Amino acid sequence: MAKKSLIYREKKRQKLEKKYHLIRRSSKKEISEIPSLSEKWKIHGKLQSPPRNSAPTRLHRRCFSTGRPRANYRDFGLSGHILREMVQACLLPGATRSSW
């Protein structure tokens, strides 16, 4: 189980990303449309004004049940070992074990 402080930190980052998403998107669109380099630098400064934690690259997917940040399966939102346990216990409908 991940520390609760790390899980709360991740939730805080998600809120910040959602809050500043439109500002970032509009600034990037302005940069792509303007041909002048000096104006691009001004807009680039505006793009750096939001907090660092509002950047989408700082977000991590976490396991829904344990909060583990690695080995997550997007389709289920679970880490690998929890996914395996749930499939073996038949708790995930439609998921089957592979054999070859």
Curated annotation (Swiss-Prot):
Covalent S-S links between cysteines: none
Any GO MF annotation of the entry: rRNA binding
Any one cellular-component term (Gene Ontology): chloroplast
Locations listed in the record: Plastid, Chloroplast
HAMAP family noted in UniProt: Ribosomal_uS14_1
Quaternary state and interactors: Part of the 30S ribosomal subunit.
NCBIfam families assigned to the protein according to its UniProt record, in alphabetical order: PRK08881.1
Protein family: Belongs to the universal ribosomal protein uS14 family.
PANTHER family linked: 30S RIBOSOMAL PROTEIN S14, SMALL RIBOSOMAL SUBUNIT PROTEIN US14M
Role summary: Binds 16S rRNA, required for the assembly of 30S particles.
Name of the protein this chain belongs to: Small ribosomal subunit protein uS14c
Species assigned in the record: Capsella bursa-pastoris
